[in-house]
Amino acid sequence: MDEEFVVTPWEVRGRVDYQKLMQQFGARPLTQAEVSLLEKYAGEVHPLIRRGFFYAHRDFDAILKWHGEGKPWALYTGRGPSGPVHIGHMVPWILLKWLFNKFGVEVYFQMTDDEKFYDDPEMRLEEATKWAYENALDVIALGFTPDKLHLIIDTKDIKPLYPIAAKVAKKLTWNTVKATFGFTDSTNIGLIFYPSLQIAVAFLPTELHGRPTPVLIPCAIDQDPYFRLARDIAESLGYPKPATLYSKFIMALTGESKMSASNPNSAIYTIDDEKTIRRKIANAYTGGRPTAEEQRRLGGNPDVCPVYHYHMLFDPDDASVEKIYHSCKSGALLCGECKQMLYEKIRKFVKQHQEAREKARDKVDAYRLSSKLS
């Protein structure tokens, strides 16, 4: 029997049953109705949605209809900066950038250095803040412009957030956050208060613009508890409910459900060099057979293979991805060749990303929200 999985904003353990998790959280499945509505307004559908990486939501259809009525809205997501960024972290950001390109709305990006400081007993606050600046380079490298991307580093840009967070905190009882997040008597009060800050950004565009400006939040599904609470209290505070679009976790190279920062070989980082990327892909778990002869005779299993999973992420051509799938199943494609194909795709992506990342190094403060409000 499979180990019972655990998913919280701070821990993912076991093999995740995504349908069961969606039902536990009370989110809705992303259906063809919502996808068609997106296509109506965006003109196309991103591969991350077509291929099922994003699979659940809250009010995604409602915010698209809001857009159709010509009303203002914004995008919001974030990152807990505890180390370098890996490709799994970037999946919601890639969709975020695509949505920005299609709709041209403002983007709010929260770097939760305070949360990571509270959560990790070994983390120094200065270290978390340093990682916030480093991780911001990966966001900027995707091509956002300073007038539209508003970076919020919690310990540096708290001023516009705190009045909203105070109102949020007054609405949330200890019993509510304890039940939602699993807090215990040993949880420090920083972590207990922190949800107020993550929720506050969902209401920030409305405060800044002085009119209802709901947000759409593309993020991994482990973040749902925050935004479930945000939706529960929004109307009582005079704010529109945030909408969410939830992704699955990106399979680890080792075959587990989610990449792990504690195991560097489970993920490809945006700062990895080509030699490291090649080694990680060469050593990746696959759905292949023990020998080439068996693979040719029996075929492989791409459904459990992180290498195929990454092809789905990095190849925009549906026909190409389908060919890899069927070639693996039939035994025509061996794992070594498949890994080499993947290496070329990822090498190209990371090389371009690293170049853009370095160009952003002296520009972070120009994107910070507080520098625009001062």
Protein language model features and the residues they cover:
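Divalent-metal (Mg2+/Mn2+/Ca2+)-assisted nucleotide/phosphate chemistry catalytic cores
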Residues: 119, 125-243
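Non-catalytic terminal extensions that flank enzyme cores
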Residues: 1-79, 231-282, 288-294, 306-374
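Short connector loops at secondary-structure junctions
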Residues: 108-123, 250-252
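Short helix-capping/linker segments at secondary-structure and domain boundaries
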Residues: 104, 204-215, 315-324
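Small-residue-rich helix-loop
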Residues: 300-304
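Divalent metal-coordination and catalytic microenvironments
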Residues: 86, 139, 222, 256, ...
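N-terminal catalytic cores of NTP/NDP-binding nucleotidyl/phosphoryl-transfer enzymes
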Residues: 43-116, 217-221
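Short, solvent-exposed loop/turn segments at secondary-structure boundaries
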Residues: 86-89, 121-125
